[in-house]
Design a protein with these regions (language model features):
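Basic/polar, cationic surfaces and motifs that engage anionic cell-wall
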Residues: 1-26, 65-190
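Secreted/periplasmic proteins that engage bacterial cell-wall peptidoglycan
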Residues: 13-75
Length: 190
């Protein structure tokens, strides 16, 4: 495809009505530039498709420390990020390791980007802000890390704050171009 990611290896299952959100961390590179973040997202997709033999990257959105939002798996499809809990579940992943021994730090732009995504999902699908969970709420794992997990109450509160700007969410497609994901048309170009 023109955005330099691989197409899904198999058809993705539809999941058109999300009702919850799960926050993850990649446990990988902590990136600050859009170019590095796109490269890391392609690496994750390659690992998921060729290493884990999944159809596509597991997550719907990737967020870097600079606050860039990268659309990954199409929003209207079933994710592969929370074993036995993917139905109706939007996966948002932070690039980096927010846990010992590295302890990458969350940033204000990154948290603002997650909050923007959350408000968009609340407005578009009627999600309850309380539906935001960390991966560790579903299984025994460090994810999304001891430094990101405590941010969940703050993010839940931000999900519920109305914003005039939320008619659309601006995400970055994989060429680094800005793609608008509107409430009327939730499919931004990957």
């Amino acid at each position: 495809a023109e955005w330099r990611a691989q197409p899904p290896t198999n058809p993705l299952s539809p999941d058109p009505l999300p009702w919850r959100v799960t926050l993850h961390h990649t446990d990988g590179r902590y990136t600050m530039s859009l170019a590095e973040s796109l490269e890391e997202t392609r690496f994750i997709q390659d690992f998921h498709q060729n290493g884990r033999k999944w159809s596509d990257i597991a997550y719907h959105y990737v967020v870097d420390a600079a606050g860039n939002i990268i659309e990954a798996r199409p929003l209207e499809t079933l994710g592969a990020h929370t074993l036995n809990n993917n139905e109706g579940n939007v996966g948002i992943v932070l690039l980096g390791r927010y846990h010992a021994p590295r302890n990458d730090q969350t940033t204000a732009p990154q948290l603002a980007a997650v909050a923007t995504l959350g408000r968009f999902l609340v407005k578009r699908f009627g999600l309850e802000p309380a539906s935001l969970k960390g991966h560790r709420d579903y299984k025994q794992t460090d994810c999304p890390g001891d430094l990101a997990y405590p941010k969940l109450p703050e993010l839940r509160a931000a999900f519920g704050v109305p914003s005039k700007r939320l008619a659309t969410v601006e995400a970055v497609d994989w060429d680094g171009q800005r793609a608008r994901n509107s409430a009327a048309s939730p499919s931004a170009t990957r």
